[in-house]
């Protein structure tokens, strides 16, 4: 009975000592958190291993992440993985579609993004661009003649239109002189003509008798305006003037209208501020609807694919520029010892328990061996 009691005692003590020793060793990895002193002498094994080597641990963790976890090869494979690309494209399409189907106005969206002065800035920028383009256009065309400046099609249209213009002028002139206003104006012109020629008026009056001069002249004027020869004469005159104009410099226009006035007139016609305002008052959905399908189905997949291809080719330089090792090192260095302990224990808690149990098991087995040795020795 005493023999079995001795074996049980040695086994129990061995298990307790083995388990406690391993448990203590595990605790000493983290504790104490700070060095302990007796007088001026530092107590051995203080602080614990991990608090003491925290800076080295941070450096090694950073190296481990870069050299073994987030490697260029691993990230490159992920970026070129077909399933990953499909998932990313689908996600991008959903997110872009959410933005493009937003019913809020562009103005509201920009204000939400703290872009408050976009309307004023856009108006000023567009007006500036228009003015610059107009000035550049005029600067170039002022070196040309009208024949050089106008396209060949315009030349043809003007030359083909000259006979029609002649006919229109003569038609309007005929209608004018047939009217009472035209007759009155013609009468005044005749009176003014003869006013300084009194003797001539008396002579004409002797030939015409009681018929007024204007009654004789008006039909002749109308008859003259209706003749084909008159139309051809006016056409020839207009054609000659057109030929003269073609040889003149465009720059002569500046004597009548300044560049600034031309630019100002065009800006007034375009109404940039009003146009920009109307555009910003539209909803995002209204603006994007014409191109929504193209962007979702073509632009987004193409952009994501190109972006991933570029990322896969340049992943090494991207990682180098990110300095991931330094980021991990800095983050770990900022951890308190308690947080670092909790972090390690949350990962290795079960394994550390098994080590404690293993120590107790080994201690118990050693106790059994000791008990057997004592038994045989007796």
Swiss-Prot record:
Its main location: membrane. InterPro entries: DUF445, UCP032178. Pfam families: DUF445. The chain crosses the membrane at residues 1-21, 357-377. It is found in: Cell membrane. Coiled coil: none annotated. It is a multi-pass membrane protein. One of its GO terms (cellular component) is plasma membrane. Keywords: Cell membrane, Membrane, Transmembrane, Transmembrane helix. Belongs to the UPF0754 family. This is UPF0754 membrane protein BALH_0780. It comes from Bacillus thuringiensis (strain Al Hakam). The lineage of its organism: Bacteria, Bacillati, Bacillota, Bacilli, Bacillales.
